[in-house]
Amino acid sequence: MARSKCCVRCCKVSDYTLQSLPIRKQMEKIPSFTIDHERLLRGIYVSRRDQVGGEEVTPFDIRMKEPNREPALHQGAIHTIEHLAATYLRNDAEWRDRVIYWGPMGCLTGCYLLLRGHLESRDIVDLMRRTFRFVADFEGEIPGAAPRDCGNYLLHDLPMARWEARKYVEEVLDCITEAQLAY
């Protein structure tokens, strides 16, 4: 049986390595991997600026944990924060039309927020304060935490999400410094 060229599952792992890719020499580090994570503080950072269809988009790094220096967020907690924050942001009267995306970082040390427009970190401190207070004070059913609505609806931890959100508000957002607003 011939192997399909598009199906990694049927190929040996050794068939696909970065060394064997013809574009290897052209690959550069992506901007987020050039940030010194050994010095990065919890805070709100402009990750970069993107142009999409003639419009500027500002991706923010909402850093809730100091990378490699404190435990990462628990999967259930960050998943619940994702659901609650995304719901809050898309319902915020002032910002909902600018929200493109809210979601967790793969490293589980924070989230990404993509907003339309040329924005600075300081511009969204109040929005983040309100968002995380909403999460910290939330009671009831988690929006979208049902089999029909979510790909992993059982992976939620509301008490831990509330605890992490409160900690972020009290220790970061309520006393944020300039060092926590720029890489």
Where are these regions (language model features)?
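Active-site-adjacent, His/Asp/Glu-enriched structural segments that form or flank metal-binding
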Residues: 103-174
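Low-complexity, highly charged intrinsically disordered N-terminal segments
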Residues: 172-183
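M16/MPP (pitrilysin/insulinase) zinc-metallopeptidase core fold and M16-derived inactive scaffolds
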Residues: 67, 71-123
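Cysteine-centered motifs
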Residues: 6-11
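His/Glu-rich zincin catalytic helix
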Residues: 20-77, 81-89
